[in-house]
Design a protein with these regions (language model features):
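Hydrophobic/aromatic-rich core segments of domains that either
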Residues: 309-395
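Long hydrophobic segments that form regular secondary structure
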Residues: 388-483
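Short, conserved helix/loop micro-motifs enriched in His/Cys and acidic residues
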Residues: 281-304, 334
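A surface-exposed beta-strand-loop module
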Residues: 84-155, 186-221, 406, 410, ...
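Surface-exposed, acidic/Ser/Thr-rich flexible loop segments
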Residues: 62-64, 69, 122, 128-183, ...
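Early extracytoplasmic/domain-onset interaction patches
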Residues: 22-73, 79, 396-423, 456-457, ...
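Cysteine-centered nucleophilic/redox motifs
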Residues: 52, 133-135, 168, 272, ...
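Secretory-pathway-linked proteins and extracytosolic
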Residues: 142-290, 413, 419-435, 483-485, ...
Length: 608
């Protein structure tokens, strides 16, 4: 009996211990320390010094996550030096990296981009890895004077695993101004001067690991980050505009050939988007590895490939040559914009702003662009190539999205639905460019709600850069599913509403914000005349939810054998914080509830 009690007590202790994992045991690895030092020398050369100590906790940490380290550099202008690459094993044995642990390869993003085949990626394979080991990694990159035009860093401070200590140091010659901003953390910079340098340092402790969830902000605005540069927006963008050479004769002749016979400006735009976006290869080289400096149009044309910036510049020059006034524009999320801080590294995108039919449109280089990109840039700052702020092409009130569907239908005893529908779309999902290109493309507005094969005829009542309104004759066969004497069907919703956000799984709670591409305002009002011999089985349905985030209203009533169906959803903000997420969840659970989407009819058996 005594032994039984001892075993029972031991089991409880072991179970309790297994339920109280330490922070270390909850993660695959742990950065004991990371240090990054950026140094600008008086002659314009730069030095980057990186160090870390990483403890490996699980097999995943060395099999998939941190078994190798990757360093991209330009061997002709940058010198890579390793100070320490060694592993301290769990028993204290130190294993230094052998010579064959260092291998140069072409960076993946430079594959197929001959103009950037000079870049190299040093792949460092860490050796002696096992559970509980620690890797000490220390290297430096020295850049020759003139290779990098300025300091331009945009550092997300979190890693995929926790960091116990992170230190970032920036050294610039005295008299050189360094502009910086720290987002989502409150640590102050420590500034000191010594030996002709001004030093800025930040120290962070116990940083949590990054959390990945669906529908996070694309610009990662929720993450802690440090941004610094020794140039203003004007000075940074001057580097982009430095090679402002005109199109050569060969390019001009080819452009002339491509646009000859095209009367409408939109057709010229589409042809040039197709030329630049589809027929010139994509060189997806990050700006920093292209030295923040675009190649000339001549070199781009000869290589038949371009970086995103080079494509925007080339399209801009082709548009202006073709008689369409275009302005190269840099769009930066407003949360990271500072008029004294010229950041290009992972901070924004380049577009072309043109005036078409008296309205300003923001263009990409994609020939499949359906709408005015300006609607997606409402929370961005737009800068011209000289770093000067320019007005938004659409105002906040004009940019509000809306989907409205109204229809009067008749349903026959064979489950065939027919009638007239009216669809209106305002804001970001309005396919204005597609409509200007081909009037027949207006049909896609109707198809956002009703299957294409159900549209018999349609009429365009309004279509401009802000929105549209169309009506259509709809005939749909086999609308319902039959289960005995019961017939079940649902009425459609638009892919331009919340369904277009592709939120597949609703977590019960989130650790990070959920971002929508736009605010939501969608309304559906249907009347359906039921066939004789069929009745609506459910009692009248009225469900409403309203909270600080928006509202849902679902109403289904029946009168004189006619159903009146009304569904509406509003979500009044794009960014939904974890604290507000429960409100979003409440609205979505009601909106997606199949009980209130399905309409169930019963066939009445008539007596012979």
């Amino acid at each position: 009996m005594k032994l039984k009690h001892i075993l029972y007590f031991t089991a409880i202790v072991l179970l309790a211990g297994s339920c109280q994992k330490s922070t270390t045991e909850e993660h695959d690895a742990l950065f004991k320390s990371i240090k990054k030092v950026y140094e600008l020398k008086p002659d314009g050369s730069m030095n980057y010094h990186y160090q870390h100590q990483l403890k490996y906790i699980t097999h995943l940490s060395f099999n998939r996550m941190y078994g190798e380290s990757f360093i991209i550099y330009h061997p002709d202008y940058q010198e890579l030096t390793f100070n320490t690459v060694e592993t301290t094993m769990a028993d204290g044995k130190v294993v230094k990296a052998p010579e064959n642990a260092f291998n140069k390869v072409l960076p993946r993003f430079a594959a197929g981009a001959p103009a950037f085949n000079h870049l190299r990626e040093m792949v460092v394979t860490h050796t002696g890895l096992e559970l509980g080991c620690t890797v000490n990694f220390d290297y430096e990159i020295h850049s020759r004077a003139g290779y990098l035009p300025f300091i331009n860093e945009n550092i997300i401070l979190q890693e995929d695993v926790p960091v116990e200590q992170l230190e970032i140091v920036v050294k610039v010659p005295e008299g050189t101004e360094l502009n910086y901003t720290l987002l989502n953390l409150d640590t102050e910079a420590k500034v000191s001067s010594s030996e002709g340098y001004t030093q800025y340092s930040w120290k962070f402790k116990n940083l949590n690991n990054r959390v990945y969830e669906s529908n996070q902000p694309e610009d990662q605005r929720h993450l802690p980050r440090l941004i610094f540069a020794n140039v203003t927006p004007e000075e940074a963008l001057q580097q982009v505009a430095a090679e402002d050479s005109p199109l050569n004769d060969e390019i001009r002749q080819y452009v002339t050939q491509r646009i000859t016979g095209k009367k409408k400006e939109i057709h010229i735009i589409r042809e040039l988007q197709k030329l630049v976006g589809d027929e010139i290869n994509d060189f997806n080289i990050p700006l920093e590895y292209a030295r923040y400096t675009p190649r000339t149009p001549d070199k781009v044309w000869q290589s038949n490939g371009a970086t995103p910036l080079e494509k925007s510049i080339l399209l801009n020059k082709m548009l202006n040559f073709s008689g369409i006034k275009s302005e190269l524009t840099y769009a930066q999320p407003s949360f990271m914009y500072d008029q004294s801080l010229g950041i290009l590294n992972g901070a924004g995108e380049f577009y072309n702003v043109v005036t078409l039919n008296g309205e300003k449109l923001v263009l990409t280089t994609d020939a499949r662009q359906a709408n005015n990109q300006a609607f997606y840039l409402k929370d961005h700052v737009l800068l011209d190539i000289h770093g000067q702020s320019i007005d938004q092409p659409v105002s906040e009130t004009e940019a509000e999205p809306e989907v409205m569907v109204k229809a009067n239908f008749q349903l026959n005893s064979h489950g065939e639905l027919s009638g007239r529908a009216e669809v209106s779309v305002l804001g970001a999902n309005n396919p204005y460019l597609n409509y200007l290109d081909q009037v027949e493309n207006a049909r896609e507005v109707i198809q956002s709600v009703f299957p294409g094969n159900t549209i018999q005829d349609y009429e365009v009542k309004q279509f401009d850069f802000l929105g549209n309104k169309l009506s259509a004759d709809i005939e749909q066969k086999e609308l319902w599913k039959n289960q005995g004497d019961y017939y079940i069907f649902s009425l459609p919703r638009s892919s331009y509403g919340i369904e277009g956000e592709h939120i597949r799984i609703l977590l019960q709670e989130r650790e990070t914000p959920l971002q929508l591409s736009q605010t939501i305002n969608e309304t559906y009002e249907y009347t359906v005349k039921l066939p004789e011999g069929f009745v609506f089985t459910a009692p009248e349905i009225t469900r409403e939810r309203t909270n600080t985030l928006g509202s849902v209203s679902i109403t289904i009533t029946e009168e004189d054998n006619t159903l009146n169906v009304s569904h509406s959803l509003t979500i009044n903000q794009r960014m939904i914080t974890p604290e507000e997420y429960h409100n979003f969840l409440e609205l979505m659970h009601l909106w997606r509830n199949e009980t209130f989407q399905e309409i169930i009819l019963k066939k009445i058996q008539t007596e012979n």
